[in-house]
Amino acid sequence: YEIADRDWSSDVCSSDLVMELKNKASILNNVLAGKINLGIIPTVSSFILPTEIFEFLSSNPKIELNVKEMTTENIIKGLKSGELDAGIIATPYSDAEEFFADFLFNEELMVYSADKIANEKDDQFIMPEDIDVNKVWLLEEGNCLRTQFENICHLRENSLKPKNLDFMASNINTLVHMVDKIGGLTVLPELAVSQLSDGQKEKIHRFKKPYPSREIGLIYYKPTYKQKILDELVASIKNSLKPKLNYTTHPEDFVNISPQ
């Protein structure tokens, strides 16, 4: 490997170059090693970080993964500035069309409700029109999951909260807690359901077919010497989640909801 026209005046530059050379050497020797800076949207990170991500790192001890919870917009900014090597977001996303994208998984969107949701046939499946849109707890503006729920149902301000309270949650756990303590309902991605207690799982309602779902993908600015690491990460997450998700069994029964 030939090095030319490098500025060695900076210790930081030298350190970065040494790390880059070590990473390339490891890949050439077929050893998965190196450092990846990864941004993940909060509605995904909580559910794959302690499972799929940890499992991947356990199998690849020479990989250093720096993970940050970030909004989609900040992930895009981080990729453009070089702060991030890759990001995990809800796809497709129009502002991210300039990036390469690898599919990770599709997961169903479900309703979490403190009360039984009435429907004409009194079965376990609900229609968007069955939802009392005045009792919905939402994530803060700019969150893709919020937008997806708004795209399923026409939502208005939650009438359960005090008139002098301006509240928008930043994470799914807060929404679950608000439903449990105050009432109302919210939307949960399928992976969040696995972390609920048995009692809480009884509050889960599925929509009628076609079931709404969201697509999650990994985006990156351009292929680099770190590409093999990203490819292995994508494969690891896909293989781990594929047998766990409803979409896998009958994909024809689902419709993807836009994150914008």
Give the ranges of each region predicted by the language model.
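Central regulatory/effector-binding core of bacterial HTH transcription factors
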Residues: 29-94, 169
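Secondary-structure junction motif
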Residues: 119-121, 134-157, 226-230, 234, ...
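Hydrophobic hinge/microswitch elements
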Residues: 71-76, 80-83, 90, 142-204, ...
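Beta-alpha-beta core module
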Residues: 96-102, 107, 124, 173-223
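Flexible hinge/capping segments at coil-to-helix
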Residues: 99-137
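A late-sequence structural motif
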Residues: 48, 203-246
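Alpha-helical linker/hinge and terminal dimerization helices associated
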Residues: 10-29, 233, 237, 244
